[in-house]
Design a protein with these regions (language model features):
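Intrinsically disordered, low-complexity regions enriched in serine/threonine
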Residues: 20, 39-226
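Accessory recognition modules or surfaces
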Residues: 17-41
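Amphipathic alpha-helical segments
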Residues: 1-17
């Protein structure tokens, strides 16, 4: 009913994923993440999205967030906490409340564009790029855990996966770092010193938390450089 109501208001789902659960009786009630786009945000190099999170077991209500999807790398980002987040409990007129929440997130798209354009206008030198990557590593791996240092380096996070990502603007550096952190596949060393490959982040909560933190890190650097 919620999806039907959102579709009727012009929001189209483009990606759905769900949390893996071991308990069979929880499987149909697991948390879902749905990335939706209004008709005005269908085309472009990157598009703004409304992200809908829901857990059907009643443990949490609906959560709506703003996000950006970048087509060239099929990368989905989540905007920082300064951009509207709407929570809708599983009570009352749920469908209408979720629709209202989606339009509230839509109102925040101008701020997303402003921050995104600001990042594209900022150029980072080599030291600044490494400082950004170092801070990003600390979001993913606990820097205080001396027994389990980060298995990869700043230079690995900054390595572009495609030619067009070799630019030095903050937005592109942010994209490279985010993609390498979340998609995994980087060769490194485990705690015991054995060769390993980093795993992609598949958990919904962990993915959203890291993505929001990375956005806030990038926006903080944008403000420092402005």
């Amino acid at each position: 009913d919620v999806l039907r109501g959102l579709r009727n208001e012009g929001f189209q789902p483009f990606m759905v994923c769900q949390t893996r659960v071991r308990a069979q009786d929880k499987r149909e009630f697991t948390k879902h993440l749905i990335r939706m786009r209004p008709a005005s945000e269908i085309t472009g190099e990157d598009v703004n999205e409304v992200i809908l999170l829901n857990s059907h077991d009643g443990s949490s209500g609906f959560q709506l967030l703003g996000g950006v999807y970048r087509f060239v790398c099929q990368n989905g980002m989540v905007a920082g906490e300064t951009i509207g987040e709407v929570r809708v409990p599983h009570r009352g007129n749920i469908v209408q409340n979720v629709i209202n929440g989606a339009f509230d997130v839509l109102d925040g798209f101008d701020l997303i564009r402003e921050q995104k354009d600001g990042m594209k206008a900022v150029t980072l030198d080599r030291d600044e790029q490494y400082a950004f990557a170092r801070s990003a590593l600390a979001l993913r791996y606990d820097p205080s855990d001396t027994e389990a240092p980060a298995p990869v380096t700043e230079s690995q996070l900054l390595a572009p996966r495609r030619f067009e990502d070799r630019r030095d603007d903050l937005w592109t550096v942010f994209q490279r770092t985010q993609e390498n952190l979340t998609k995994g596949g980087l060769h490194g060393r485990s705690r015991s010193g054995r060769s390993m490959s980093t795993r992609p982040i598949t958990g919904i909560d962990q993915n959203v938390k890291l993505n929001r933190a990375l956005w806030m890190l990038a926006d903080a650097m944008r403000q420092m450089k402005s």
